[in-house]
Structure formats: structure tokens, C-alpha cells
Regions:
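Thiol-/selenol-based redox modules, centered on thioredoxin-like
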Residues: 68-140
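Beta-propeller folds
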Residues: 3, 55-61, 110, 122-123
């Protein structure tokens, strides 16, 4: 999506608290392949962990910002563990996706982006079932 719409839409990754911190409730997550880090206690620690995440996932095409240590963005947007949002040209939430991974549907975000940009809707290829969760399409 960033390659398709990045010249018209700014894609921002907000690094929030750790979903699978070693000292958290779910240190290994579902797949057990998450990096082992403790929950940062200071903004400098969070910045260090966020930089490692940025490098590991190669988030180069995106603007990456970090939530403050009080988790203001995370709390305000119910972002944990991950969410997709579209903020429209007036600064209002134009799309709020469900909580990931079970309610994480990028096609819905693309539909909302296209609508915001005044582009014709597109038909999405049927998504394969991914991560063991059934594919879903936004009702028209």
C-alpha cells in the first residue's frame, strides 16, 4: 500500500509498548518467534527497542515515531497489540481497524484510503486464510 499510495498518503508506524515483552503477560506470543526484550521503563529504553524493531523489519519507507512512556497514543487509540488507522485530511479518524491480529484487515484500510482520495473502489482478490484466522472482506 505504501508503494501504491505513498505519494498521496503519509504512512506512519507508531511504536507502542511491547506486545510480547519478556516481563509481560505473553512473552513468547502465539508463534514463539518474537524478540526477547523487557518492557522499556524509560523513553530512552523504548527508543532503543524501537530502533531495533525498525532495523529488523526494515521500516525504511515509513515514518516511525514512538509513543511516550505513559502510552498516550496506545491508550487514546486502543492500539495494543496493533491497529490500522486512517486519519483524514481534516485530522479526524476516517478508518479504525480492529485489534490485530484477528481483526487486522489491510484491504479495509486500502478501501478507506481510496475513498478518502476519491478513487474508484477496487475488487480485492480473496485473501487466503492467514495465521489460522479466516479471511474477511468489508461489506459493500
Amino acid at each position: 500500500m505504501q508503494a501504491e499510495y505513498g505519494d498521496k498518503v503519509e504512512f506512519i508506524v507508531v511504536y507502542i509498548r511491547e506486545a510480547h515483552a519478556l516481563d509481560g503477560a505473553s512473552p513468547r506470543g502465539v508463534g514463539g518467534d518474537h524478540p526477547i526484550v523487557e518492557e522499556p521503563l524509560t523513553i530512552d529504553e523504548r527508543l532503543t527497542v524501537a530502533k531495533r524493531c525498525d532495523a529488523k523489519l526494515d521500516l525504511t519507507p515509513f515514518t516511525v515515531v514512538i509513543d511516550d512512556i505513559e502510552d498516550t497514543a496506545n491508550t487514546s487509540y486502543a492500539a495494543h497489540p496493533d491497529r490500522l488507522y486512517l486519519v483524514d485530511k481534516e485530522g479526524r479518524v476516517g478508518y479504525a481497524g480492529g485489534r490485530g491480529p484477528r481483526e487486522f484487515f489491510p484491504n479495509e484500510l486500502e478501501d478507506a484510503i481510496r475513498e478518502e482520495l476519491g478513487l474508484e473502489p477496487i475488487e480485492h482478490e480473496e485473501e487466503e486464510e492467514d495465521r489460522g484466522f479466516p479471511a474477511r472482506r468489508r461489506p459493500r
